[in-house]
């Protein structure tokens, strides 16, 4: 009698998820109820479920010196800007999201608070460039995900230029005050003495023109024809260029000042978008806008295999050459936060 024996080998295949493009969803927050661990959004929430992970983040709200002096833009109080924490969704009702954990940090809704849906994976492969929805003034600018296993890069994770926005071009009069030039640090469109400042953690201010740097945003170039200052993050931004053909009849030696550096430490544990560059001064329709800053990348994983690919969060460059007017400042670099033992 022929006896046949069959051996069956059980192979466990862990789920590998292929990702690329944009994986996060973003919502601005209109109020934070710390006592009840919940936030309110502007509209009914769709696409968020119990057990989902979300980042609660305050993007702006810093208080700065607004005097028309060299101290302009110095940070007096971060006022919650940069605070963030990872939370688990306990309940979703209409426009209210309640979290399982207590909200531990302070958030001011006026400081542009957002929640970011954070996907959770086992093993994950980045097959095409992974990026963020650019910051739009109320949400965006963040790439974040969790992997219980290995993250394999077959493409870059790139948040370049998705941070705070560069200053837009503002057309002012030629040769301020009869050619004396404007040497102030902040002004409005009525005074019209300089270009728009770049955006930073202090938000957009009423007197948003002129060379003073608002926190990590770059200052706008002053009349006449000076360049905008570069945005900043941990390091200070660079100053803009002066007018190349200075003359007694039309000054131009007060360029935009580079953004102020931000205080970052393991104790504070803050995360910031890169500051936007200031615009160049424009009176002949040839200036260029400031460039956007870099975004934030947050990854928690067991291990990351790079395969020669990179995680990038540079400030954007100003790619257009100014003509007869000031050039915009480049964006400040963003921030990359990793929790990966291997």
Feature locations, PLM:
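Bacterial Sec-dependent N-terminal signal peptides
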Residues: 1-17
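Short, intrinsically disordered, charge-balanced linker/junction segments flanking boundaries
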Residues: 14, 340-342
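Short coil-to-beta-strand transition motifs
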Residues: 77-86, 117-123, 153
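Glycine-centric low-complexity/flexibility signal
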Residues: 123, 130-337
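Autoprocessing Asn-cyclization modules and mimics
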Residues: 16-84, 92-100, 129-140
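Extended Gly/Ser/Thr-rich low-complexity repeat segments
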Residues: 47-60, 105-123, 155-156
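Acidic glycine-/aspartate-rich tracts in secreted/extracellular proteins
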Residues: 59-63, 93-95, 102-105, 150, ...
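Ligand-binding face of N-terminal immunoglobulin V-set domains in extracellular IgSF glycoproteins
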Residues: 72-73, 81-82, 87, 105-106, ...
């Amino acid at each position: 009698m022929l006896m046949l024996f069959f051996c069956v080998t059980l192979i466990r295949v862990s789920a590998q998820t292929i990702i690329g493009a944009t994986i996060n969803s973003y919502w601005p927050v209109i109020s934070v109820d710390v006592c009840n661990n919940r936030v309110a959004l502007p509209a009914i929430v769709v696409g968020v479920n119990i057990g989902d992970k979300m980042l609660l983040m305050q993007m702006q709200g810093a208080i700065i010196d607004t005097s028309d002096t060299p101290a302009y833009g110095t940070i007096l109080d971060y006022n919650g800007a940069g605070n963030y924490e990872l939370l688990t969704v306990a309940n979703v009702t209409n426009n209210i999201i309640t979290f399982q954990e207590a909200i531990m940090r302070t958030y001011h809704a006026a400081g542009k608070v957002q929640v970011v849906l954070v996907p959770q994976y086992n093993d994950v492969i980045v097959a095409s460039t992974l990026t963020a929805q650019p910051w739009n003034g109320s949400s965006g600018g963040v790439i974040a995900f969790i992997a219980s296993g290995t993250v394999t890069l077959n493409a870059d994770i790139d948040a370049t230029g998705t941070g705070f926005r560069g200053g837009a071009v503002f057309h002012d009069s030629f040769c301020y005050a009869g050619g004396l030039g404007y040497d102030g640090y902040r002004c409005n469109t009525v005074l019209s003495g300089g270009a728009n400042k770049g955006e930073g953690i202090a938000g957009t201010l009423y007197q948003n023109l002129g060379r003073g740097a608002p926190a990590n945003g770059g200052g706008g170039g002053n009349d006449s024809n000076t360049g905008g200052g570069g945005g900043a993050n941990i390091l200070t931004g660079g100053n803009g260029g002066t007018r190349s053909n200075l003359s007694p009849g039309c000054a131009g030696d007060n360029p935009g000042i580079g953004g102020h550096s931000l205080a970052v430490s393991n104790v504070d544990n803050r995360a910031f978008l890169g500051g936007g560059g200031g615009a160049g001064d424009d009176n002949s329709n040839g200036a260029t806008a400031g460039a956007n800053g870099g975004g934030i990348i947050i990854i928690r994983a067991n291990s990351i295999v790079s395969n020669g690919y990179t995680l990038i969060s540079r400030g954007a460059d100003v790619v257009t050459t100014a003509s007869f007017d000031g050039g915009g400042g480049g964006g400040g670099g963003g921030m990359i936060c990793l929790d990966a033992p291997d």
